[in-house]
Amino acid sequence: YDLMNNYKNNFYPASYDYTMTTPAKAIVSSSYFFANPSKPTQPLGFISADIEWVKYAGTRFYSNDNNQEVVSYYNDLNYVIKNTYQNNINFKIGSEVKLNGNWMARAGTAFYGSPYKDGGFKASQFVLSGGIGYRTEKHFIDLTIMNTMVKDAIFPYRLTEKSSYYADFKGNNLMFNIGYGIRF
């Protein structure tokens, strides 16, 4: 369906009044805490995992305007969303371990699958992270490094023919974070 071709000669004012339903999401999480063998009442660390289901195809736009042309545009947009995107399952796992004294180390990974129905579009994210933290009763400081590896299909515009009108994007995003907090 060619959404843009049907509306190419129609110009709407720069102000829109619509309602958007964001994708539904459900998460199942689990954690396991383990104790220090020499001090069983003190936790040594934990492992946690999440499985997340996201209904990208369920995103919807609704016009708050009764103008039939505007309503028709949003109906067509919803049709394109429903036929372009799919439901997806994402995975996350992480762990934190108390080292000695007030020091802690953590590591994690996440995988976010492709939201596109068309398997030809390679789109996903893979995240690796690690960090250290120092905590006292009143203060804490955390240092984290996170590397996000992204694959995506970038569409600058949509055409009726689907041949090669998108760009395969691959990228890495390396981030360093420092956090400081005061407990009161």
Question: Predicted regions: what is each one?
Answer:
Residues Y1-F184:
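Outer-membrane beta-barrel porins/channels
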